[in-house]
Amino acid sequence: MKPKRQYKPGPMDNCQTPAYALDPILPYLNRDWTWWEPAEGKGNIATTMRQNGYTCWGTDIETGYDYFDYCPSGWDASITNPPYGLKFQWLKRIIELGKPFALLVPVEMIGAKTAQDFLKTIPFEIMLLNRRVNFVMPIKGLNGAGAQFPVMWLCSGILPEKIVFGEINYPKKQL
């Protein structure tokens, strides 16, 4: 039986991640691990991972799996673009789960006291991206307009250095 959801996503919490956002992080992800994508949405991240030879499966609140109440068995690490309205709660929960993770989050998150308080408790790494990610927005779709803010990969147990620089190359056609 699926757990009941406690959070109703806001209209801007359903932004889909284009495949190219994973290009910089993929070389650092362990192919021997089973990856869990807990905010799967339309499945862009999980699909991109599988297309690149990773074992990855996803769950989502829209299909009845509330990340804050549900934790599947058999996964080694998590990768997701969490709903930004819940970014601090999401970070707290993933730290509590005690496994490696990669979260695609706004760069400004690292400057917030709440995030810093959580991050002081674990070893973590960040991947700064040279360009902004143009997310597929729930209302506008992918209209080619520039992203509103820069994002980074916030990780624990993934990257070889505390700070890594990643290169985004925009494709001619995005997911």
Each model region followed by its residue ranges:
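Class I S-adenosyl-L-methionine-dependent methyltransferase catalytic core
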Residues: M1-L175
